[in-house]
Structures are given as C-alpha cells and as structure tokens.
Amino acid sequence: MRIRVVPRKWFLDRRGTDEEKMVFGTMNIISIITPPYPKDGFEDEDIPFSEEYRNAGNVLVVKFHDTEKQWNDDVVLMNESEADRIYEFVQRTMDNGNGAYMVHCTAGKSRSQAVGYVLNEWFNGKHGVRPDQLAYDEYEGLYGQSRTMNSLVRRLLMNRFFGDSLKVAPL
C-alpha cells in the first residue's frame, strides 16, 4: 500500500486543479487540521482542498493540536476516539480501489508523519521488525525525521491498529 505524507500547502497549491481532482479520485485522504487556539488569536485552520471533496467517502478530517501534553485547557490532544476514527476510516476504505493513502497536517512533519508511519507498518510491515523494537538511530535511519514525529499520535495509533499484542510506550 502506498502511503504519502505531505504538508497542508501541498493541497492549497492544487486546490481547484485537475491534479486535485486526480488525487481525490485515486487516493484516500486523512486531513489533520489544527483547531483554534484563542489565547494566541489562532483561528480554526481551514480545510485546504476544494469544498466538493470535504465530505467525500474517501476523506477523513480530524482536528487536534500538534502537542503531546495537555498544558492548558485550550489544547486539543489526539485521543483514543480520534485513533478509533482513523482506524475505522482505514478499515472502511482500504478495499475501495484507491490503493493509496495521503496524509497531511500543517507542516507534514509531526502529526501526519506519525499517521503515515503507523499506516506503513500496518499495511506494509517493512523491515521485518516491529517498530517498538527499533532503536532511535535505526528508526531515524529508516524513517527520516523521527525526532519530529508526534509520539502521542504514534502511540495511540499503534495501540489501536496493533491491539493488545503491542502496547507502545512514548518515544
């Protein structure tokens, strides 16, 4: 299964184009949006693709901040409910003929990388080793920017996708 992780800007640059139409016709999309953060005056992040695709069956939109700790009441953390939504979306769409997943968050480096990592492990089982058995340096060599991956997102999704056979501790 092909998994592609991109920044939000990738979709913004293609909004309303034939390429956007092709992507939504051939891939399943997981869109991670940053919710508002009133204390900093941050508005709700807009979904970066055309209106016609926002409620498509091959699109899932989730909203949570790119943080691993609840440091004030306005922070929306990834939680088990969101992990369930992602898992159920993948279960529902994996046989729809699209054959690939595209995941985005604001920068395409932390939340979406964690989702892409788990999907890759679940679909492709690369490298013949479970991810919880990889040393940090091995992991970084295999997956690139590991130090930017949101470990809360990774842990919740690994636990949801791999169940009780694999309980992942934070990186």
Q: Residues of each region from the PLM?
A:
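Helix-loop module immediately N-terminal to the HCX5R catalytic loop
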Residues: N58-M102
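Lipid deacylating catalytic domains
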Residues: S50-L60, S81-E82, G163, K167-P170
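PTP/DSP superfamily signal
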Residues: Q91-A100, L119-L171
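A phosphate-binding catalytic loop at a beta-strand-loop-alpha-helix junction
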Residues: Y101-V118
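Short catalytic/ligand-binding loop motif for oxyanion handling, primarily in non-cytosolic enzymes
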Residues: P38-K39, K69-Q70, K109-A114
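Short beta-alpha junction loops
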Residues: P35, D66, T106-K109, D137-G144
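A structural signal for well-ordered alpha-helical segments within the folded catalytic domains
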Residues: E80, D84, Q113-Y117, E121
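Glycine-rich, flexible N-terminal cofactor/catalytic loop recognition
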Residues: M1-V62
